[in-house]
Structure formats: structure tokens, C-alpha cells
Design a protein with these regions (language model features):
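N-terminal intrinsically disordered/low-complexity leader segments
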Residues: 1-6, 201
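Generic hydrophobic, amphipathic alpha-helix propensity
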Residues: 7-16, 32, 58-62, 66, ...
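Helix-turn-helix
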Residues: 10, 18-53, 57
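Hydrophobic/aromatic residues within well-ordered alpha-helical segments
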Residues: 51, 58, 62, 87, ...
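Amphipathic alpha-helical linker/stalk segments
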Residues: 56-87
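A short secondary-structure junction motif
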Residues: 61-69, 98, 114, 136, ...
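Amphipathic alpha-helical packing segments from all-alpha helical-bundle domains
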Residues: 82, 93, 97, 101-102, ...
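Hydrophobic/aromatic-rich alpha-helical bundle segments in the mid-to-C-terminal region
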Residues: 119, 137-191, 200-201
């Protein structure tokens, strides 16, 4: 059993390396098998039915915020002062890894050219994070911690407040030249966000 888990992890590590260097289109099952030092590419299919499934699993294991929202039930009743910084840290810490930065840049370019890549990434990452935030906001409204509002918009608004910080790591370093640290940014944005949604007396 341990050997099976090790082999699976070996494949995921190799796939992450290949996807971050070559993107989804450039990485092949054969090249991933070679990087993983497998005797045959067909061994990958023992663990993953196709390249898309392997890519989804790489995203699952390499994006911290997805691990955070994997078990949403444990978070829904916690106060927003605690949960929103957790989500923000998970999102922003993704881009501290140079390989993850490369993969994100490649995925953005590929998603613009290939709708199927946009769909995979959208369903695996964006839809799940926004879906969690929407459910969380709705629960906080029920608990009286946030005023009634359209949780679809607040979920998008919260993530939107983090995009410049992520963009400074990925594409525009100039944003970070005189900018706050991640902790300073998430503290300020969470405060602004929650002040705007606090219950009205």
C-alpha cells in the first residue's frame, strides 16, 4: 500500500514539473512517465484514467486553497474574521512557489486559446472556491453575522480584492514595489470587506 502511494506521489510530482514547464498541451503522458522514471507510460493509467484527470489531481494537491475548502462543513459555522483570512492565505500562498507561478502563467495563456483548458481549470479551481465562498456567506447571513445580500457577488468581490496581490507575484512585479505584504493586505481587505457587510441595526 505504501509503495502504491509513493508511486502515485511520484507521478504527481513529475506531472507538476511537466505541466509547470510545458503547460497542459506540451506535457504528455510519455514525458511525465519519463520524468517520473517509470518503465512504461502505461503505468500512469493505473492511477489516472487520462491526462485531464492527472491535471485535475495536480491542481488539487498543489493549490492550498483547494485543500482548505475540501471539507467545507468544518468551516461554515466559523466566524468570517477567522475563515476569510484562511482562504486568502491559501490563495496567495499558491503563488509563492516558482513552479506554481510558471504553471499559472502557462495556464492563463492556454485557457485564453483553448476553451477546454479554461473549462477544466474553471471547474476544478474557480468554481469550487467561489462555490464555497457563496455557501459560506449564505451561512453567515443565516447566523446573523453578515447583513442580507447576494452571496454570489460577495464571493466574487472578496476574491477580486486579492487579485492585485497575486498579479504582483505572477505578472506585474511593479505592483509589489511599494505594496503591502500578504498579511498586511489580507488584514486590510478582510476589514474593509466585513465592515461593508456588517449587520445593520
Amino acid at each position: 500500500m505504501a509503495e502504491e502511494s509513493d508511486r502515485r506521489g511520484q507521478i504527481l510530482d513529475a506531472a507538476f514539473e511537466e505541466f509547470s514547464e510545458k503547460g497542459f498541451k506540451g506535457a504528455t503522458i510519455k514525458s511525465i512517465a519519463r520524468t517520473a522514471q517509470l518503465q512504461s507510460p502505461t503505468l500512469i493509467y493505473w492511477y489516472f484514467p487520462d491526462k485531464e484527470a492527472l491535471f485535475r489531481e495536480v491542481l488539487e494537491t498543489r493549490i492550498p486553497v483547494l485543500r482548505t475548502v475540501r471539507d467545507p462543513a468544518g468551516l461554515l459555522d466559523l466566524p468570517p474574521e477567522k475563515v476569510l483570512p484562511i482562504i486568502a492565505r491559501g490563495y496567495l500562498s499558491t503563488f509563492d512557489n516558482p513552479a506554481a507561478q510558471r504553471m499559472a502563467r502557462l495556464m492563463v495563456g492556454e485557457a485564453m486559446r483553448r476553451p477546454e483548458i479554461a473549462e477544466v481549470f474553471g471547474n476544478t479551481v474557480i468554481k469550487r472556491v467561489l462555490g464555497f465562498l457563496k455557501a459560506y456567506m449564505e451561512r453567515q447571513i443565516e447566523l446573523g453575522r453578515l447583513r442580507p445580500h447576494d452571496a454570489r457577488s460577495s464571493a466574487r468581490a472578496f476574491m477580486g480584492m486579492l487579485i492585485p496581490q497575486a498579479g504582483g507575484k505572477l505578472i506585474f512585479p511593479v505592483i509589489r514595489e511599494d505594496g503591502p505584504t500578504d498579511e498586511e493586505h489580507l488584514e486590510t481587505t478582510a476589514s474593509i470587506f466585513l465592515e461593508g457587510l456588517k449587520p445593520r441595526n
